[in-house]
Curated annotation (Swiss-Prot):
It is an enzyme of class 2 (transferase). This is Mannose-1-phosphate guanylyltransferase 2. The keyword Iron does not apply. Disulfide bonds: none annotated. Coiled coil: none annotated.
Amino acid sequence: MSDAPIIAVVMAGGTGSRLWPLSRELYPKQFLQLSGDNTLLQTTLLRLSGLSCQKPLVITNEQHRFVVAEQLREINKLNGNIILEPCGRNTAPAIAISAFHALKRNPQEDPLLLVLAADHVIAKESVFCDAIKNATPIANQGKIVTFGIIPEYAETGYGYIERGELSVPLQGHENTGFYYVNKFVEKPNRETAELYMTSGNHYWNSGIFMFKASVYLEELRKFRPDIYNVCEQVASSSYIDLDFIRLSKEQFQDCPAESIDFAVMEKTEKCVVCPVDIGWSDVGSWQSLWDISLKSKTGDVCKGDILTYDTKNNYIYSESALVAAIGIEDMVIVQTKDAVLVSKKSDVQHVKKIVEMLKLQQRTEYISHREVFRPWGKFDSIDQGERYKVKKIIVKPGEGLSLRMHHHRSEHWIVLSGTAKVTLGDKTKLVTANESIYIPLGAAYSLENPGIIPLNLIEVSSGDYLGEDDIIRQKERYKHED
């Protein structure tokens, strides 16, 4: 019997706050370029080039759909393969939906699912690929394989896997190096983590899994039939919408929320662990990002326009301004267009407290950056004051803004580069570089980029209310545009 095809299932729905102010609710860390020229999501997908995989499935939520689609398009991985969760229900249901879809896509086969987080770093990519190849026959045998990271130090922020006896070798193979799992352990205290470190039989839980789609669904049906039944219904009613696989919100919101660890892994007798050293990090804090980054002779990590004098072991990031640091040590400084973080490295775990304060004060800095992505391009809110807002808008070639109007504001557009095709009422006009056009309050208008280069323009809005919800669409260019 030939081996089943491998389908990577990439979980990209998180909204983490531990890397604020770079990571925001609408632009979390999986979409950031933290190590190299690609984002963590893109790197996760490109890492699979060392394996023989079918096109991957990426699971995300409604809010992130356009960012995910654009990042997949940039690396030529966009192919109707983004599953949109209408509401978050943790990993067990998300993986179940993926398993049903994989079986539907491969009706004559029982594909292997390789479950990955979109926001992890794996430095030793060839070792990772070798580990997956070694696990393939084990998973084809019907085992549920999890990959345990050989710990480098006593870490209290990770869950652990306690190994048992060596698993039964495959026919024709010597010891495969896979162990049965005794138990999964939640994040330990410091004393317990030290014991795990010295025991030699505990591994960090990486959240990387490999199993047959049918095996996962069988175990889920055995231990959590309530989740299985809802996901079966949801998967059967899913439908394709452009690059997205959409699920029924009415059905999916009835699904219990549960992690794969609690729903299946802690209960199944089919689980084996493969210990690996793949240079893994979940990049869960500014400290861990400093740990894995390339450093200067003084131990500094500097990203952006940075000047330093007499500094040591700092992480300094600048998005849009010159940052100068003098005489500091073991600090984190992160500058974005609308926020600056300054912290001791030893205190960065308290970043979540700042995010909680922003939420209580109903500020927007925890939700989004100044720069916001849309299916047609992006905009950057440059300035705002009483009765006015200034944006820089970039429209991709061939894309445009749907026919719309505003009740509370008028707009002036000044084209910086490219060509704008503007429909205002019953008239259409081309507006080119150094030209402008006025959109009166209450007027119906649309904007297109008919050219082959990006359209850059400045928008100045003025009126009593300037919120993004004062957009009355009369004809949608993109389904579910915002």
